[in-house]
C-alpha cells in the first residue's frame, strides 16, 4: 500500500486515540481563525487528490467554518402571515447540506476562482469545518492542461451556486441506481412532469 492508502485508513478510524486528539487540537486551532481563510496546504492530501486536487500552480484551498444546526426562518419579530400550517419559524431544516453552504461561501468570496470540490476536516458542538478546492482558470498551468480545460469554460462559472458540485448534487437527489428513480430525466420536476403528463398518441 502507498502512503495515501495508509492516510485514508487513519481518517476512516476517527474514534482512535490519535485521531481524536488530532481532531480536537485542530478544531481548537480552526476556531481561532476567521470563518473563511486560505489554507497553506491540504489537511487531507489523500482525500483532496481523490477529489481532483494537485499540488501545483492554479490550485487553491480555502478552509470554511459553518455553524451547525437547522435554519431559522428570517421573519421580523416572528411575524408570519397566511395559514397556521405555514407559521413555522424555528424547527425548520435547510434543504442543502452544510458542505454545500461552505462551497457557496468560498465561491462567493473568491469570485474569480471556480469551485472544484470540498471535503470535511473537523467538527465540534457548534461548527463544522470544510476545505474547499478552488481553481484559477486564468492560470496557464490550468488552461494548458488537457485534463482540466473543461472547468475553464464559461458554463462552469459558479457551479457551486447551481448544485453542480458533488455536495450540491446530493441534495438534488441525483445519482444512479434504484434509489434515485425520483430524478430520472435530470431533476425531480422533470420526472414529475413526465409522469403527470397525459400523452394520447395518434393511432395510425
Curated annotation (Swiss-Prot):
Belongs to the eukaryotic ribosomal protein eL15 family. One of its GO terms (cellular component) is cytosolic large ribosomal subunit. It holds the Pfam family Ribosomal_L15e. Its main location: cytoplasm. It comes from the Eukaryota. Keywords: Cytoplasm, Ribonucleoprotein, Ribosomal protein. GO terms for molecular function: RNA binding; structural constituent of ribosome. Component of the large ribosomal subunit. The ribosome is a large ribonucleoprotein complex responsible for the synthesis of proteins in the cell. The lineage of its organism: Eukaryota, Metazoa, Chordata, Craniata, Vertebrata. The gene is rpl15. Component of the large ribosomal subunit. Disulfide bonds: none annotated. NCBIfam families: PRK04243.1 (NF003269). It is found in: Cytoplasm. This is Large ribosomal subunit protein eL15. InterPro entries: Rbsml_eL15_core_dom_sf, Ribosomal_eL15, Ribosomal_eL15_CS, Ribosomal_uL23/eL15/eS24_sf. Signal peptide: none annotated. One of its GO terms (biological process) is cytoplasmic translation.
Amino acid at each position: 500500500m502507498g502512503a495515501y492508502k495508509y492516510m485514508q485508513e487513519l481518517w476512516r478510524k476517527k474514534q482512535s486515540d490519535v485521531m481524536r486528539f488530532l481532531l480536537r487540537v485542530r478544531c481548537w486551532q480552526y476556531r481561532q481563525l476567521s470563518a473563511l481563510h486560505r489554507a497553506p496546504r491540504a489537511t487531507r492530501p489523500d482525500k483532496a487528490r481523490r477529489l481532483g486536487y494537485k499540488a501545483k500552480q492554479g490550485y487553491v484551498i480555502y478552509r470554511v467554518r459553518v455553524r451547525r444546526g437547522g435554519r431559522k426562518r428570517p421573519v421580523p419579530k416572528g411575524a408570519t402571515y397566511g395559514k397556521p400550517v405555514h407559521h413555522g419559524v424555528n424547527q425548520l431544516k435547510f434543504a442543502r447540506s452544510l458542505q454545500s453552504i461552505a462551497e457557496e461561501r468560498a465561491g462567493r468570496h473568491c469570485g474569480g476562482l471556480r469551485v472544484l470540490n470540498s471535503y470535511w476536516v473537523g467538527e465540534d458542538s457548534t461548527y463544522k469545518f470544510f476545505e474547499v478546492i478552488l481553481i484559477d482558470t486564468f492560470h496557464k498551468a490550468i488552461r494548458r492542461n488537457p485534463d482540466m480545460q473543461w472547468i475553464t469554460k464559461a458554463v462552469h462559472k459558479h457551479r457551486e451556486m447551481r448544485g453542480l458540485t458533488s455536495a450540491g448534487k446530493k441534495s438534488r437527489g441525483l445519482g444512479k441506481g434504484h434509489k434515485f428513480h425520483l430524478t430520472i430525466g435530470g431533476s425531480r420536476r422533470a420526472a414529475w412532469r413526465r409522469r403527470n403528463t397525459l400523452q394520447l398518441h395518434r393511432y395510425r
